[in-house]
Amino acid sequence: MERYEEIEKSIITTYRKKIWCQFIKGVKEFDMVQEGDKIAVCISGGKDSMLLAKCMQELKKHRKVNFDLVFLVMDPGYNPINRQKIINNAKLLNIPITMFESNIFEVVDKIDDHPCYICARMRRGYLYKKAQELGCNKIALGHHFDDVIETILMGMLYGAQMQTMMPKLHSTYHEGMELIRPLYYVKEADIIKWRERNDLHFIQCACRFTEHCTMCDNGGGGSKREEMKK
């Protein structure tokens, strides 16, 4: 058995209850995948998006619904080490990625106020646009259960408002496009266990604010979201 096959098997055996069943629960409950969909699975290079890619591959193998997948990697300005790490991990995991470039890190590097927020918005815009060019009608992001809770807390503590991260939503600016979050019910602790059991090493956020920990994939970087984790 190839190593990628062992990693795939662990998702539906060792982590069947904690990861696979929670993934399926989200997909079914929110009707995320439909007949004829072409879904761009957006890969940042971290543990969450890489797990999402593997789960979506497994879903395509086992589900009766007919749908297509594209595994989309946007290079926002990674250094050569991080870029190569993503390519190597995709090869290890048997994920056929499509990679394209943008200058997001260069732009965000000049912004002092809320750079992480601006970076996230710009990333999503580029991903929507590229996915549309490739004929996709949906993008899938790797946000998990902890991200949902942290978003609510961040809104309450920093924005004085109640806001949440929806499991799926229609794009306001890209007609016909929808965003889905299939890991909506999967907890980060279980993703970390999956990563460690399979001895996988992914990149963390790799902009100038967090580059000192890009290879550790264990948080850090001083963002508001990281403050929530602590």
Where are these regions (language model features)?
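ATP-dependent adenylation/nucleotidyltransferase module used to activate substrates
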Residues: 2-153, 158-162, 166, 189-197
